[in-house]
Amino acid sequence: MQRLKSFYLETIIPKLKEEFGYVNSYRVPKLKKIVINRGFDESCQNSKILEVLLNELEIISGQKPIISKAKKAIANFKLKEKMPVGMFLTLRSEKMYSFLDRLINLSLPRIRDFQGINKNCFDGSGNFSFGLSEQSMFPEINFDKMIKVQGLNITIVTTAETNQEAFFLLKELGIPFRD
């Protein structure tokens, strides 16, 4: 079992029950999934660059991403139908906890002048989204093989009903929030 998951089960669940007064264990908020999204511009239409970005996301997450394609052509954006516009993947269960553990303990501390993540990024339903400006902070990425600096968006979906519940859950899991 992942270290972060066992920490959640043994330590965080009792704290959440005490803090919010849950009687039923099934009402306690938990992580549902983590969605990693990466969009790209027209310079990434080159198949080599696209393949490198795909491999980077696969190395970071341990799972192969799905390429999202344009549904219709838009001339102003120089976009053709079925042209790749981004990639995403959804992590659940063990891979989700593994990725979150590596993100909190290895990747975020490697960001230069990191002050913490803005805590105003909740959506009102207990989900938390934030963006990272570059992929080089992940220890799995070889800086020499990196062709293009490309950011990614991470959404952490929880079963929490309010932002306060989700904030308490993520704070206890160890996500460094800005004060």
Curated annotation (Swiss-Prot):
Subcellular location: Plastid, Chloroplast
The keyword ATP-binding is annotated on this UniProt entry: no
Residues making up the signal peptide according to the UniProt record: none
Main location: plastid
GO terms for MF: rRNA binding; structural constituent of ribosome
Cysteine disulfide links: none
Gene Ontology CC: chloroplast; ribonucleoprotein complex; ribosome
Domain of life: Eukaryota
Keywords associated with the record: Chloroplast, Plastid, Ribonucleoprotein, Ribosomal protein, RNA-binding, rRNA-binding
Gene3D superfamilies linked: 3.30.1440.10
Record GO biological process: translation
One Pfam family per UniProt: Ribosomal_L5
Stated family: Belongs to the universal ribosomal protein uL5 family.
Subunit structure: Part of the 50S ribosomal subunit; contacts the 5S rRNA.
Annotated HAMAP family: Ribosomal_uL5_B
General function of this protein: Binds 5S rRNA, forms part of the central protuberance of the 50S subunit.
NCBIfam families: PRK00010.1
This protein's name: Large ribosomal subunit protein uL5c
Species this chain originates from: Euglena gracilis
Protein's gene: rpl5
